[in-house]
Swiss-Prot record:
Protein name: Putative ankyrin repeat protein RF_0314
Natural source organism: Rickettsia felis (strain ATCC VR-1525 / URRWXCal2)
Cross-referenced PANTHER family: ANKYRIN REPEAT DOMAIN-CONTAINING PROTEIN 54, ANKYRIN REPEAT DOMAIN-CONTAINING PROTEIN 61
Domain of life: Bacteria
Covalent S-S links between cysteines: none
Alphabetical keyword list: ANK repeat, Repeat
SMART domains hit by this protein: ANK (SM00248)
Repeat region (ANK), residues: 94-126, 130-164, 168-199
Pfam families assigned to the protein according to its UniProt record, in alphabetical order: Ank_4 (PF13637)
C-alpha cells in the first residue's frame, strides 16, 4: 500500500496498519490528494534526515493522530529553526504559512501549535494567495469552541490586524458575520473599540468588563497601539 503526501512529491510504503516499515521514499510527479500521511511519519523524518525543509514541515500538519503534532511536530520545528528555516515560509502552491495551517486543522489547533509558533515569532498578518491571514482562516472554521476563541485572542495579542482585507475585500470582522459566533463577535468588537478608542457603541456591563480582564485588552489610548 502506498500513501500519497499532499505537499511533497513522494510516497511511503506502509503496512496494513498504516505504518511506515521501510526506510525508503519513492518519488513521483503527480500530487493532489488530501489523504492523510502515516502515523509515524514524523518519527520517520526525524530518524532519516538531518536537514528539515519547509516542505517537510508542511507535511507534518497531515499526520493522522492529533497527539503526534504536539509530541513530534514541535521537535521537528525546533530542529528546523536551529537550521535557520524561516518561520514565515509560505507554501508555494497556496501562500499559506505554518501558522495558517496550524489554525486550519482542528487536530493541530488542539495541540497548541499556534501558540508555539507565535511565541517563536510567526507573523499573524501574512496573507496567502487568497489574501487570507491566519485570523481569516480561523474565523471561517465550521466549528467554534473555547479553544478557537483562545487562539483568536492569541493571534490578536501577537498583532493580528482585524481590519486587513482578503482578495474578496473581507476583513476578519466581516468574515465573522458569516461564522456568527457570539463570543468571537464580542472579542472582535472589544478589540476594535480599543483600537479606535471609541466605546460609544458598546454596552459596558459587568460581563463586558470581565471579558476585558480575561482577554487582557486595555481600554487606555496609550495601549491601543498594540492592536
Amino acid at each position: 500500500m502506498l500513501i500519497k503526501n499532499k505537499y511533497k512529491h513522494s510516497m511511503f510504503p506502509v503496512n496494513q496498519n498504516n505504518i511506515i516499515e521501510e526506510n525508503e521514499e519513492i518519488k513521483f510527479d503527480l500530487i493532489d490528494t488530501d489523504i492523510e500521511i502515516p502515523f509515524n511519519y514524523l518519527t520517520y523524518i526525524l530518524n532519516s534526515t538531518s536537514y528539515i525543509t519547509p516542505e517537510i514541515l508542511f507535511d507534518g500538519f497531515k499526520v493522522v493522530l492529533p497527539f503526534y503534532q504536539d509530541v513530534q511536530l514541535k521537535p521537528l520545528f525546533e530542529l528546523a529553526f536551529d537550521q535557520d528555516v524561516n518561520i514565515n515560509s509560505q507554501n508555494k502552491d497556496n501562500g499559506c504559512t505554518f501558522l495558517h495551517y496550524s489554525v486550519e486543522d482542528v487536530k493541530v489547533l488542539y495541540d497548541n501549535i499556534p501558540q508555539f509558533l507565535l511565541e517563536k515569532g510567526a507573523d499573524p498578518n501574512i496573507q496567502n494567495k487568497d489574501g487570507n491571514t491566519p485570523l481569516h482562516i480561523l474565523i471561517n472554521r465550521d466549528f467554534f469552541s473555547s479553544k478557537e476563541i483562545y487562539v483568536a485572542k492569541l493571534l490578536i495579542q501577537y498583532g493580528a490586524d482585524i481590519e486587513l482585507k482578503n482578495l474578496l475585500g473581507w476583513t476578519p470582522i466581516q468574515c465573522f458575520i458569516q461564522a456568527g459566533n457570539i463570543k468571537l463577535k464580542a472579542l472582535l468588537q472589544l478589540v476594535k473599540a480599543c483600537k479606535d478608542n471609541d466605546f460609544s457603541k458598546l454596552d459596558i456591563t459587568t460581563k463586558d468588563i470581565k471579558e476585558f480582564l480575561d482577554w487582557q485588552i486595555s481600554i487606555t489610548p496609550e495601549n491601543s497601539k498594540f492592536f
